[in-house]
């Protein structure tokens, strides 16, 4: 209601000035062009008049595109906030009632579990240095296992060569013992045991 009265008063004050400016003839050529509208509201031809929509259709289209409840001008919003909404009393201090908190009873065994976790953490303190040491040890072991797998045939060949050398040395020691005992040759049906070359 208040907004309707205010807008009607503003329209009354603005309309006479608009009529005066339109009715006042301009002096000279410059004045006539100053108050002459740059466009014409009347259609130029009957075909153009038939193509243009009516005022009712245009207003319905505007209401459909921009509803009146959503289209609020800044003036209307300011007037609504200034006169219709209740004002806040600054002098009266606002006191907020403290909310009541209720402590729920603990569950059975929860305190014991928490105590056990605390004791475990206290017994085995975890440090960044210890974690890095463990990770480095695991990585070194992993690299060593990969190296062993990659060089297993080469190491087998080296090991077999060492065993052959040990077997030859063992046979030489046996021959030296025979000669020292007074035997020129080994006894009949004697086979030198293959101690180091078990698979051969």
From Swiss-Prot:
GO biological processes: mitochondrial translation; positive regulation of proteolysis; protein ubiquitination
Pfam families with a match to the protein in the record: COX24_C
Subcellular location: Mitochondrion matrix; Nucleus
Name recorded for this polypeptide: Small ribosomal subunit protein mS38
CC per GO annotation: anaphase-promoting complex; mitochondrial inner membrane; mitochondrial matrix; mitochondrial small ribosomal subunit; mitochondrion; nucleoplasm; nucleus
Keyword vocabulary terms for this entry: Mitochondrion, Nucleus, Ribonucleoprotein, Ribosomal protein
Claim: Transport is one of the keywords in the record: no
Family of the protein in this entry: Belongs to the mitochondrion-specific ribosomal protein mS38 family.
Subunit structure: Component of the mitochondrial ribosome small subunit (28S) which comprises a 12S rRNA and about 30 distinct proteins. Interacts with Aurora-A.
CDD domains per the UniProt record, alphabetical: At5g63150_CTD
Function per UniProt: May act as a negative regulator of Aurora-A kinase, by down-regulation through proteasome-dependent degradation.
Listed SMART domains: DUF1713 (SM01155)
Annotated tissue distribution: Ubiquitously expressed and especially highly expressed in heart, skeletal muscle and testis.
